[in-house]
From Swiss-Prot:
This is Actin cytoskeleton-regulatory complex protein end3. CDD domains: EH. Keywords: Actin-binding, Calcium, Cell membrane, Coiled coil, Cytoplasm, Cytoskeleton, Endocytosis, Endosome, Membrane, Metal-binding, Repeat. Component of the PAN1 actin cytoskeleton-regulatory complex. It comes from Aspergillus clavatus (strain ATCC 1007 / CBS 513.65 / DSM 816 / NCTC 3887 / NRRL 1 / QM 1276 / 107).
């Protein structure tokens, strides 16, 4: 059993960040959370997977527990504790209050057990048995693109909004309505995201020649009947999902892939030119925690380079070069360049420019400023020492010349 856990000091740090972003609300939407998550410099697909894992209840927002999960995953990725985003949320990261939701999600994401199927009375020739509720990642991504392109301001999809899709499919109207009724047991005018994905999955299989199922798993039916899920589409459109490769073969290998024609018309599918309309966070205020992480990483890189330079310098010192004398001109030039860089970095931190964006909490950056200041003073002392050594070498050279 894993002994890992989120420590109390981490929870307190995450709470400070959460409170500063939530404006007193109990949840963060995608726009608010992205202002700190994107500062980790992780790739968009990694952040998307982190969000999907952390959003345990699937409401499109992060409460404080889910935010802690997301932050720990991101920090572990940044610090090298994780090489990639895990496929499922580790048990030690699952919030106790949401353990039942994680268990249900895992049951739905895998291949569920096959339920006994009532024999279809449809006499349409050529239809096949073998409908599978499992959605592979490529199909699910395409379903989510269709959902995103047709949802209303409440995050729901109406039957009429998908008429363009129906026209592009080889599915009779009666079967389309049968699939709609199957995922809409309450006969509502619109269905939520989970029901929409299941509806599109049924149409996909029917388009490929499979019979429409007569029943749905109880766990899915419960999620269809729950209309309280709020995906917060008013706040921000979610980032574009990675679509399936257009070269992937269909189930039959004979028809256009489900939804490709429809998505192409919308300009959001396959290899189209669709770009997400989400908020641009490129000018968002940098979070000091990420700044500290990056500074530590840069410091480690600089120390490694310094060690390598020292070793190379020692190697050159052991070899006869320029009458056995070290290249003090080059050493002085490099030391001055490093000093100039550190002074500029310190000046930017004090003035709030450059990496330290306007509006940063300067109180939290004092430690970083002090560290950089100490480095600058150390470099100045080192430069003075090198100058003394250089003067001494010149003096020795001059004395040697006079003795001759």
């Amino acid at each position: 059993m894993s002994t890992k856990k989120i420590e109390q000091w981490e929870i307190e740090r995450y709470w400070e960040i959460f409170a500063s972003l939530s404006n007193g609300q109990p949840h963060l939407n995608s726009s608010q959370a992205a202002s700190v998550l994107r500062n980790s410099r992780l790739r968009d697909e990694q952040l998307e997977k982190v969000w999907d894992l952390a959003d345990v209840d699937g409401d499109g927002e992060l409460d404080f527990e889910e935010f802690c999960v997301a932050m720990r995953l991101v920090f572990d990725l940044v610090n090298g504790e994780l090489q990639e985003v895990p496929r499922v949320l580790p048990d030690w990261l699952v919030p106790e209050s949401k353990a039942h939701l994680v268990q249900a999600g895992r049951a739905l994401s895998g291949r569920p057990e096959q339920f006994e199927r009532i024999e279809d009375e449809d006499d349409t020739p050529g239809l096949k048995d073998g409908f599978d509720w499992y959605m592979n990642p490529a199909d699910k991504s395409k379903y989510e693109e269709i959902y995103s392109a047709n949802r209303n301001h409440r995050g729901e999809v109406t039957f009429e909004s998908l008429q363009g899709l129906y026209d592009s499919l080889d599915v009779p109207d009666t079967d389309v309505r049968s699939a709609w009724n199957l995922v809409n047991p309450s006969a509502s005018p619109a269905i939520n995201k989970d029901a929409t994905l299941a509806f599109l999955h049924i149409l996909n299989y029917r388009h490929e020649g499979f019979r429409i199922p007569r029943t749905i798993p109880a766990s899915l039916r419960a999620s269809f009947e729950n209309n309280k899920i709020d995906y917060q589409v008013d706040n921000a459109r979610p980032a574009q999902k990675w679509g399936a490769d257009g070269s992937t073969e269909t189930l039959t290998g004979r028809k256009t892939k489900f939804g490709d024609t429809y998505l192409s018309r919308l300009g959001v599918g396959g290899k189209g030119s669709y770009t997400p309309k989400g908020t641009d966070f490129s000018d968002t205020i940098q979070d000091e925690e990420w700044e500290k992480v990056r500074l530590r990483r840069e410091l480690a890189e600089m120390e490694a380079k310094l060690d390598a330079a020292n070793k190379a310098s020692e190697g050159r010192r052991d070899r006869p070069r320029n009458d056995g004398r070290p290249n003090w001109v080059l050493i002085k030039k490099e030391a001055l360049q490093l000093l100039e860089y550190k002074e500029r970095e310190l000046r930017e931190l004090r003035e709030g420019t450059g990496r330290a964006k306007e509006g940063q909490d300067l109180e939290r950056l004092r430690d970083d400023i002090k560290t950089v200041g100490d480095q600058v003073e150390g470099l100045k002392a080192h430069l003075a020492e090198r100058k003394d050594v250089l003067a001494d070498v010149r003096r020795q050279i001059e004395e040697e010349r006079l003795h001759r």
